[in-house]
Amino acid sequence: ALTVRNLFSAGLIGLLLVIALYHLARYLMRRTDLGSAWFTLLCVLVLVREFTLSRMADYYPYVPTDEIFSFLIRVEFLSFQMAGPAVMGFVGVVFPSVRYRVLTRLAWLASAPYILISIFMSIQAMSIVLKSYYLIMAAQILSTLVYLTYCGLRGRKYAWVGLFGCVVLALGATHDMFFAHGFQGSGYWTTYCFGVFVLVESYLLAAQSTHAFKQVEKSRLDNLEKIKAQM
C-alpha cells in the first residue's frame, strides 16, 4: 500500500513541478502576469506538503531521528499555513476586488504568528497551539468560496471554474486535516484533490489568457476595418 501511495505521490509531485516551472516561465516573460506568479507559489506549497508527508510515511517504520522528524513536520506545517493566504492571493489577482484583497492581507496577518510558531517553538508546543489555526483556515476557505460564488453570480468569466477548483481543494484540505488526526480515510483523496485543483486552475489561467488574446485580435481587426473604410 505504501508503494502505491508513493507512486501517486511521485506522480503529483512531477505534475506540480512541471506546471510550476511553466507558470514561472510565463511570469518571468511577462512580469504583469501576477496570476501565474501566485499559482507558481501555490504549486510549490502543495509540492512541499506532498513531499514532506510522503517522506514522513517512508520514515515512520524506521523511527526517524528527532532532527529529521522536526524538520519535516515544521516544513509541512509551514506549507499548510501559507496555502490559505496564497490561494486568496491567487483568487484576488485573477478576480480582482479591493475588499477581497483586504481580506487576503488579513489572512496573511492572521497566519504570520503561526508561521513564527512553526519556526521557533518546540514540536510538542507547536502541535498544541496550531490546532487553533484550523478555525482560521476554515474562515479563509469559506470567504474564498463565498467570494467566487458572488463572482459567478455577477457573471465574471470563468468564476465557476475557479469555484470548482477551490471546492475540490477545500475538500482535500479538510480530508487532510481529519486524516492527519487519526480519523478514518484515505491519503489518496488528498492527492487526487490537489491534482484536480492544479489542473483546473491551470486551465483557468490558460482560458483567461486565450480570451484576452482573442479580445486583442478582435480589436486589431476592428481597427483595420476602420482604416480600410476611411481609405
Stretches found by the model and what they are:
Residues 224-231:
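PAS/LOV and related PAS-like sensory modules
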Residues 24-27, 51, 224:
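Short linear motifs in intrinsically disordered/low-complexity regions
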